[in-house]
Amino acid sequence: MIKSMILVALILAFASAKTCKYDSSGFQSYWRFANNSIMLQFMNTDIKNNQWTGIGFGDDKNNLVGVFFMVSNNQVTVRTGSTTEHGPPNFNQNGTNMGSSVSTQSALYFPEDETMSAVVQIPVQFQGRNLQSCQKWRWIKSGKIENGQLTRNSKSPKDKKVCPMECN
């Protein structure tokens, strides 16, 4: 019930601008471009405690920058960094790089149905990339967190060529 109310509130919050959507097995994402940033609602509907997930940006699968979500002790932590298609993320010092900080609006984990949902605001100029331009976005399923260390993700990320201003 609470999860549904939060999802409806987030969708209504996105309704004031053109909202884009990605829905694929295990993921639901909504985003909109406004005020030189991208407001992203990221949901992974198949993530367990002590796992990580994320979204990477870039056409080169071996050189992605992204926002990563760690679920540990049923709490969600948000960090930024870089990764490859299967590698665990390398985090930026203090989670930011080159002044491009990500603002977390909400981050929740629902252990009873293994769903993680977060709303983040990402600056268009993000870690040396212009997210306003068309490029691949890659939804990373999950990797384990073992003794505080992130392991490789075992499945290839789902990708989509995204032009944030066009909702393609």
Swiss-Prot record:
<keyword id="KW-0732">Signal</keyword>
<keyword id="KW-0325">Glycoprotein</keyword>
<feature type="region of interest" description="Disordered">
    <location>
        <begin position="148"/>
        <end position="168"/>
    </location>
</feature>
<feature type="signal peptide">
    <location>
        <begin position="1"/>
        <end position="17"/>
    </location>
</feature>
<dbReference type="InterPro" id="IPR005018">
    <property type="entry name" value="DOMON_domain"/>
</dbReference>
<feature type="glycosylation site" description="N-linked (GlcNAc...) asparagine">
    <location>
        <position position="35"/>
    </location>
</feature>
<feature type="glycosylation site" description="N-linked (GlcNAc...) asparagine">
    <location>
        <position position="94"/>
    </location>
</feature>
<feature type="compositionally biased region" description="Basic and acidic residues">
    <location>
        <begin position="156"/>
        <end position="168"/>
    </location>
</feature>
<feature type="domain" description="DOMON">
    <location>
        <begin position="25"/>
        <end position="143"/>
    </location>
</feature>
<dbReference type="GO" id="GO:0005576">
    <property type="term" value="C:extracellular region"/>
</dbReference>
<keyword id="KW-0964">Secreted</keyword>
<dbReference type="Pfam" id="PF03351">
    <property type="entry name" value="DOMON"/>
</dbReference>
<protein>
    <recommendedName>
        <fullName>DOMON domain-containing protein CBG21753</fullName>
    </recommendedName>
</protein>
